[in-house]
From Swiss-Prot:
Organism: Caldicellulosiruptor saccharolyticus (strain ATCC 43494 / DSM 8903 / Tp8T 6331)
Lineage: Bacteria, Bacillati, Bacillota, Bacillota incertae sedis, Caldicellulosiruptorales
Biological processes per GO annotation: ribosomal small subunit biogenesis; rRNA processing
Subunit description: Binds ribosomal protein uS19.
Pfam families (alphabetical): PRC (PF05239), RimM (PF01782)
Domain notes: The PRC barrel domain binds ribosomal protein uS19.
Function: An accessory protein needed during the final step in the assembly of 30S ribosomal subunit, possibly for assembly of the head region. Essential for efficient processing of 16S rRNA. May be needed both before and after RbfA during the maturation of 16S rRNA. It has affinity for free ribosomal 30S subunits but not for 70S ribosomes.
GO molecular function: ribosome binding
Localization (cell): Cytoplasm
PANTHER family: RIBOSOME MATURATION FACTOR RIMM
Main location: cytoplasm
Alphabetical keyword list: Chaperone, Cytoplasm, Ribosome biogenesis, rRNA processing
Name used for this protein in its record: Ribosome maturation factor RimM
Similarity remark: Belongs to the RimM family.
Length: 169
């Protein structure tokens, strides 16, 4: 399990006084209201205190206390913001962080190894796990539904699925 979780990616500056545009990597951009600070993924010792933020067109405009000019803000471009896992919102039962799903081995209910999760597609209605197949050339697309995903064990690194017609084609 990862010790830090990504919550946003800085994609540009905003204005001249050090604000930045952040693509939120959380389900709710309002999540930032609960955070006093974030860290830079590539420099965990650099703490950025959130002075204020606002959401505009699914982008978060954020001001950090430590950044006061456009030149300083430019140095943050294309960097990821993270928080410590223990500061993350508690997830409902049977809900997982994407970073914990990626890398899981996928087995059918008979114990046959089918593949490994390499990405998660967020469709709106339900997530879809994209798995590198061990049994064919095409990736497996596994809907993240209780009828299909029967067990997820993050600690042991696997999930078990019920294979439905067409899933392995």
């Amino acid at each position: 399990m990862y010790k830090y979780l990504q919550v946003g990616k800085i994609v540009n500056t905003f204005g001249l006084k050090g604000e930045v545009k952040v693509i939120p990597l959380t389900d709710s951009p309002d999540r930032f209201s609960e955070l006093n600070y974030v860290l830079l993924e590539d420099n965990l010792s650099q703490k950025l205190t959130i002075e204020r933020y606002r959401v505009k067109d699914n982008i978060v405009i954020m001001k950090f206390r430590e950044i006061s000019s456009i030149d300083e803000a430019l140095k943050l471009k294309n960097r990821f913001l993270v928080i410590e896992r223990e500061r993350a919102k508690k997830l409902p039962e049977d809900t997982y962080f994407i970073c914990d799903i990626i890398g899981l081995e996928v087995y059918d209910l008979d114990g046959r190894k089918l593949g490994k999760v390499k990405d998660v597609l967020q469709t709106g209605s339900n997530d879809v796990y994209i798995c590198q197949s061990y049994i064919g050339k095409k990736d497996l697309l596994i809907p993240a539904l209780k009828d299909i995903v029967k067990e997820v064990n993050i600690e042991q690194g696997y999930m078990k699925i019920k294979v439905i017609e067409g899933l392995l084609d």
